[in-house]
Amino acid sequence: MVKMIVGLGNPGSKYEKTKHNIGFMAIDNIVKNLDVTFTDDKNFKAQIGSTFINHEKVYFVKPTTFMNNSGIAVKALLTYYNIDITDLIVIYDDLDMEVSKLRLRSKGSAGGHNGIKSIIAHIGTQEFNRIKVGIGRPLKGMTVISHVMGQFNTEDNIAISLTLDRVVNAVKFYLQENDFEKTMQKFNG
């Protein structure tokens, strides 16, 4: 079996620490203690790293298509490596959840998230595993774009750091148990 863990975000240093890049941050945290080196693959339009965990090949992916076209990279990789949709997890930000809240789902709509809209459009289904990290709603008078492209304040940064640790633990648990339902039961909340 082959697994693929995708973190959504935008490429480039100017977006590196923005709320919208929580998926990239999660991938970086997951691979921190693994022997994974990323390569910038122009064919797949993604940064890709891989390793074996429990005798299974696991790909860690950060699409370089910019958020709104993430589905291009995800579809290309699923097809090329013949990865089953049930072996895909997508990690991304959710502004409809409080900062640092974590929610795991095995299906659902895009909920207004353009990266998820793109993935659904390209793979043709809403039924794929996802880990949503809350980034909160914009403050009064602030646009959604300026909110998601902004950085976390000091207080939220601490909370997000702890949440990213939970994301790492959830992904490790999933890779160990090979059961997303069980992972949802353990880590939702």
Swiss-Prot record:
The active site is at residue 20. Its EC number is 3.1.1.29. GO terms for cellular component: cytoplasm. Its main location: cytoplasm. Keywords: Cytoplasm, Hydrolase, RNA-binding, tRNA-binding. It catalyses: an N-acyl-L-alpha-aminoacyl-tRNA + H2O = an N-acyl-L-amino acid + a tRNA + H(+). The record marks 10 as: Discriminates between blocked and unblocked aminoacyl-tRNA. It is an enzyme of class 3 (hydrolase). HAMAP family: Pept_tRNA_hydro_bact. Monomer. This is Peptidyl-tRNA hydrolase. It comes from Streptococcus pyogenes serotype M5 (strain Manfredo). The gene is pth.
